[in-house]
Design a protein with these regions (language model features):
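Extended hydrophobic packing segments that form well-structured cores
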Residues: 30-137
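C-terminal catalytic subdomain
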Residues: 1-50
Length: 137
């Protein structure tokens, strides 16, 4: 299967990536999980793709759902056997604490960058912290 993934939210932050992959499993739907004040999350339709030894979860709906271990369990992936798990999140890695030997934070370009000054602000009242120097009161 050749498919375009990602890059659909805002073309300013990246374009879709063409992948040639094998469909490993189809699933998704609603998950009952107590997470960050939510009692459940809905992935919508989801597919697990394989590109060589790499597994990629692609979901219909955006959100935090793909950042919970129950999603891997849903697709019969044992996290204890994984050499590496990459999450598209800056904070939800805590759910993986029992499997973590190392956390490597990566600040990728796009709408979730930690470098707020690099975002294309257009209608932002100035000055505003942390983008501008603020006068001491």
């Amino acid at each position: 299967l050749t498919v375009m993934v990602g890059g659909k939210l805002d073309p300013n932050f990246g374009t879709p990536l063409e992948l040639t992959a094998e469909v490993v499993a189809i699933g998704g739907g609603r998950f009952d999980v107590n997470m960050l004040g939510f009692e459940s999350f809905d992935l919508g339709q989801a597919v697990l793709l394989a590109v060589g030894a790499i597994r990629i979860l692609v979901t219909e709906k955006r959100g935090i759902g793909g950042n919970h271990p129950s999603v891997y369990e849903h697709f019969d992936i044992d996290l204890a056997d994984a050499k590496m798990v990459v999450l598209k999140t800056a904070s939800n890695w805590q759910f993986y604490q029992q499997w973590i030997s190392e956390v490597i934070r990566v600040d990728t370009p796009g709408g979730t960058t930690s470098h707020l000054e690099e975002l294309p602000w257009q209608h932002l009242p100035r000055p505003i912290y942390p983008l501008d120097e603020m006068a001491e009161e």
